[in-house]
Structure formats: structure tokens, C-alpha cells
Amino acid sequence: MKKKLLALSLVLAMLSACASTPSDSIAATPTPTEAPAPAAEPTPEPTSNPSQTPAPTMAVYDEVSFDDWRAAAGCTMPDYSFSAPHTPQPFEKVAWPAEGVTLRTYVADTLEEAAELYHTTVETLKELNPDYEENYTRNHGQYWGLKLQAEPYTLPMNNVVSVTVSAPWVENQYDRTGTYNVPASLDKQAQAALATAYYFQYKWCGMHGGFWPYEPVDDLPKWLQGYATDGAFYTKFSEFSSFLHGVYSDAWVDDLLNEEPALFAEGENDTILTGDGDRGSNVAYCGHLFTEPELQPDGSVEFWQLVLICESEEFAGWGGEEPVVPDTATVMPIRLVPTEDGWRVNGVNLPN
């Protein structure tokens, strides 16, 4: 039986680097259905002026195939299967909004950071959010949920590919497999890298934190609980490091392994020291969509993950007969950076 060794309040702090939207309550995610999606509509851009585009700084690399990327990982990688491209499908009790949604930011430390992330200006953010100072104080020194444009935002219905990621050696059946939608216009290697990031973070660095099973060890630093044993995703730190660097940018990996308190650390004899904990999810989560990935002047690829939430006071959970219609989209930018060995994910926030 897996031990819950940390109080939820501590766990939420430990998972902050890997977490997604703020946790309101714990609820099962509604099951997607095969209901047809509405026809795509033109997606208006935010009305603000875009910030200055970055100067080209990254080298140009030849495309790396999915098979070559997986073979060169330097560790045992999961198995993958890819669906055909398809339109996004709503959850069983969700209806796509017909009249657009309120577009909001995720989180930023400063207005300048928010303006750069969301391609707008500080002046526009202040105009759209007259309570921005209260927002900063209320959220303990950060900006959350700033409005990005005055008019309703029409959701894009860009095609996605469903990627199933499976690690058959993992002991916990729930952690063994996951299926995640990614933009269909990414190449296969980029699709696999992004789906793997979702898989890793949902299973061990987001909804749950840390590998299991593990052997408890006393007197470890901070919230580390023991070292991963057979049946865990990885048991050797060298393999785990190769996995991380094969999926994520070096900068993201450095942040993960050097954060305080640490969720993972290298132990003696190439072992993996691991934490252990869980967090809740947002009961009003209604799914997520993507904008179309765009190549940036610096060589990276960027797009938005649009996290759909129902903020209406009339929302009373998922037990009613009427479908739930999301009214807000939280924008979480995703960036893939090129390397000689293929695309790497420069961090991704879980949509829920």
C-alpha cells in the first residue's frame, strides 16, 4: 500500500514547479466522448500590440525522426502509439461555447513578464485590469488571471493527435499508460516529446509527486522520502537524467533538479531519491485546446494551451442534466526548442 507521507499543504508547495491551475477541489476528470466538434471559426488575435520579436539566436538543425530520437535517448523509453489527426472532442458533459470566452493569463511575477509572455503591453494589461494592484496583493506577489482582450475570444478547433505513452515495466497500473492530445501540425518527434512531458508530469511531477515504489530512508533532506526501487519509472539516476534531457530543455531540467525543496535527487550508487505526495485538481476544468504552433524568429516553436474553465456562479458540479459550458480560457504558453537531437519541451504546465 502506497504511503501518503506528506500533508496536502506541504505537497502543494512541493509540486509548485510542476503543477498546473490552482487546486480548487479534487474531482475525477469527465470522460471524453466522440461527439462531433463544431466547425472551426476564425480565431481573433488579442487586440494589444505584440512585443518586440526576439532576434534569431538558435542554430538550425536537421529534422530528427521519432525513431532516431527514441533510439538515442540513452535510457529505456516508453512505447508510443499515435492516432490519426482529428478535431478536439468535448468531455461527456461539456458543450463548446458558441459565443467565445474570456481570455486570461496564467501566472506572471511582473506586468512586464506578462506582457512579454502574452504578446501585449503593460499599458493594455492595466487598461483591461483596473484592479491589477489588488490582483498582485491577493495572489501574494504574483499576477493571476489577468484579462487579455476586451471582446470574447473565439476558441480554435485545430486538429490534434492523441498519443498513447506506455511504460510496461511500471508496477502501478494507473501510472503505466496515459493518452494525451498534442497539436497535429507538430512533427512526430515533437509530438512524442510533448506527450511524454504530459505523461511524466501527470504521473510523477504534477498530480502526483515522486516515484513509487520506494524504500524509505530516514533523515533525508527536506521532503525526500527514500530511493526508488524496482517497479518505479526509473531506479538509476543516470537513466532518469538521460530521460529528462531527451524530453526537456537543459534549463528546465536544471530547474527541476535544483529546486528547493527537491522532488528528485541523485543518491549513492546511482540511486534516485524521491519525494512522495499528491495534489488536488480544479473541479471546474472543462478540457483544453491549442492554438496553431508557429515558428519563431529564434528557431523555437510556440503555441498556446487554452485551459477551459467554467467560472459561472451557476456551476454546481457534474451531476446535472444540462451540459457545462466553459466561459474562461486560461492561456498557458508552450515552447519547444530545437537541438541537434530533436525538439525539447521548455516546460509545460498541466492543464489540470
Features from the language model and the residues they span:
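Extracellular LysM carbohydrate-binding repeats and other cell-envelope/extracellular binding modules
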Residues: 76-101, 122-172
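Core segments of small alpha/beta cavity-forming domains
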Residues: 175-277
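C-terminal motif of bacterial Sec signal peptides marking the signal peptidase cleavage site
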Residues: 14-17
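Ser/Thr/Gly/Pro-rich low-complexity, disordered linker/stalk segments of secreted
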Residues: 36-57
